[in-house]
């Protein structure tokens, strides 16, 4: 549901050298990218047909790795070429070299990351007809007055006669956005809009990205409570865990559905990856020896591992014990769950990388956990049953993920069409039973 350039003009986006124009990104399937390059450092150019040879020469001279992702001719005989670089320095060099060597033959250059960001990634669409005067009257004051009058007497029917049941607030206070220090809320929008896009695609729900200026957990809880009447559920994303926990505590027994990307996403997916790894090696959970490095970063991950039956669980604080003690411990372990991003993990033992700030690429998420493995299904379950997610529902989601994982992988692919429905069905069964 990206914006249509025919109906919307995207603002000029900053480029790697300050002059690359914004445009509309191409749509890509979820396929693995060539090694050595990163689509997050990509550009699309349009050049006159004969200039394609010069582009090839520039790519060959690059100081880093550049791959030609696509190369197509248009009806005018011009060439549209998408180039992926291995990082910022190579991309900056590429832009400068193309401008210098192509001159007027370079008809367009756009940074695909900023082009995609400038669309907002999601747009609203009208559901009610507005073609005739009769259509318009159904969304005018007299019609609204009738529905409001009814809902004032039947408040439990709000979800039946409004769009609230399909609407989700994706909230952040920008306190934990990727590797950044706390940000101004609006600066978090690109990350929140991306998450809204993926959640919408996986659930079909209308997901609204909402950065909020919350100075402390109390402000965050207040924002959630103030917005709750308009949404079926709220999902906290890119928000520090201690603020998530404090906001939950402040809200208390409020009936509004509140999920977060760590407890209802990453922790569930990481637990499923642990079980998948143990299963592939013929180790039963009860006999497994697992260490979680920096467990405070994983939300209820430790509780989830205990709940699925891991028999020997070590919670390892690298600040208190350092790294050498972990190396000495490694020989007795089946697996390490790394939540901090160990620079030199112990050899000889499998390390599951699960640092929240550095998730695996979407197209390679069969090798490591992402919140999107579990969160869409659990969100669907919560909205469908109108019940908060419980520990038992998360455990059911873990087993659904394990069952959907193909041989040789730790987790199912994120674009598996039955992934979210399978997780949702497992959680709904538990929630509907009141567990």
Region annotations inferred by a language model:
Residues 178-203, 264-338:
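Glycine-rich phosphate/diphosphate-binding loop of Rossmann-like nucleotide-binding domains
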Residues 324-365:
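Rossmann-like adenosine-cofactor binding region
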Residues 350-435:
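Adenosine-phosphate binding glycine-rich loop
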Residues 171-172, 179-180, 217-265:
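Phosphate/diphosphate ligand-binding glycine-rich loop within oxidoreductases
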Residues 9-14, 18-23:
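Intrinsically disordered, low-complexity segments enriched in serine/proline and basic residues
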Residues 113-146, 246-256:
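Helix-enriched interaction subdomains in cytosolic or periplasmic regions
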Residues 2, 26-114:
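A conserved regulatory-domain signal marking ACT and ACT-like small-molecule sensing domains
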Residues 39, 130-133, 171-183, 197-209, ...:
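Gly-rich Lys/Arg/Thr-decorated short loops/hinges at beta-loop-alpha junctions or inter-strand turns
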